Design a protein with these regions (language model features):
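Conserved active-site alpha-helix within GNAT-family acetyltransferase domains
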Residues: 99, 122-142
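A short beta-loop-alpha structural element at the N-terminal edge
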Residues: 1-18
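A conserved beta-strand-loop-helix scaffold within acyl/acetyltransferase catalytic domains
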Residues: 60-74
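Active-site rim helix/loop that mediates acceptor-substrate recognition in acyltransferases
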Residues: 26-49
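Conserved acetyl-CoA binding element of GNAT-fold acetyltransferases
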Residues: 74-90, 143
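Conserved beta-strand-loop-alpha-helix junction that forms the acyl-donor binding cleft
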Residues: 93, 116-129, 146-150
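Conserved beta-strand in the GNAT
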Residues: 49, 55-64, 82, 87
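Conserved acetyl-CoA-binding loop-helix of GNAT-fold acetyltransferases
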Residues: 88, 94-107
Length: 153
């Protein structure tokens, strides 16, 4: 199947399509605490759409921001493209669609940002680490782990 990726403006039609796809993502229950987007969640981000014969197959949105202070990872003022969301319909996963979306955003951000950054709350952390580390050649810099304490409200 032939697909294309393009950057899109947040028109009412684009926002409605992204919100509908994010509702599908929420229904999957594949990410801890994920809820469908509102227009406010998307506005202010750069939007990249993966389209094919079946319409909208996936999306990535994010934005460039400057780090505020020095950290063990990077110096203050470093420009980073923060990927807020990357989603591909289940029937189009494991076909290179997500990687293509990421690489398109990466090429678009080149020259504006020094790094690409992403956080994830997926329940399938092994697969997502493989995707970002092995397929997209990202570096692993930090992790945030949680444990529910028994007997706590």
């Amino acid at each position: 199947m032939e697909t294309r990726i393009r950057e899109a403006e947040p028109t009412p039609e684009v926002l409605a399509a992204l919100i509908a796809l994010s509702a599908d993502w929420e229904a999957e229950q594949s990410c801890h605490g994920y809820r469908k987007n509102t227009a406010a969640d998307i506005e202010g981000n750069r939007i990249f759409l993966l389209e094919g014969e079946g319409g909208l197959l996936g999306y990535l949105f994010g934005h460039v921001e400057q780090t505020e202070k020095d950290s063990s990872i990077m110096k203050a003022g470093t420009a980073c493209f923060e990927v807020e969301e990357l989603y591909v319909r289940p029937e189009h996963r494991s076909r290179g669609c997500g990687a293509a979306l990421f690489r398109f955003a990466e090429e678009t951000a080149r020259g504006e940002a020094d790094y690409m950054m992403v956080s994830t709350a997926t329940k399938n952390w092994r697969a997502i680490l493989h995707f970002y580390l092995e397929e997209l050649d990202m570096d692993f810099w930090s992790a945030r782990l949680f444990k529910k304490l028994e007997g706590c409200a």
